[in-house]
UniProtKB/Swiss-Prot annotation:
Topology in the lipid bilayer: Multi-pass membrane protein
InterPro entries: DUF1328 (IPR009760)
Protein name in UniProt: UPF0391 membrane protein Bmul_5473/BMULJ_06024
Principal location listed in the UniProt entry: membrane
Parts of the chain that traverse the membrane: 5-25, 30-50
Annotated family: Belongs to the UPF0391 family.
Keywords per UniProt: Cell membrane, Membrane, Transmembrane, Transmembrane helix
One Pfam family hit: DUF1328
Superkingdom of origin organism: Bacteria
Intracellular or extracellular location(s): Cell membrane
SS bond list: none
GO cellular component: plasma membrane
Amino acid sequence: MLRYALIFFVIAIIAAVFGFGGIAAGAAEIAKILFYIFVVIFLVTLLLGVVRR
């Protein structure tokens, strides 16, 4: 479960680079939304991984 949390964290960082880097307006908005979604998924999987141990 912790592995999935790290994967979602990396995806969130990549989305942040694209979203906050100023590539294009449309892509930036999508990347910002994806960033927040994957951060939430990262936190949920991190908590589930800690609780199950």
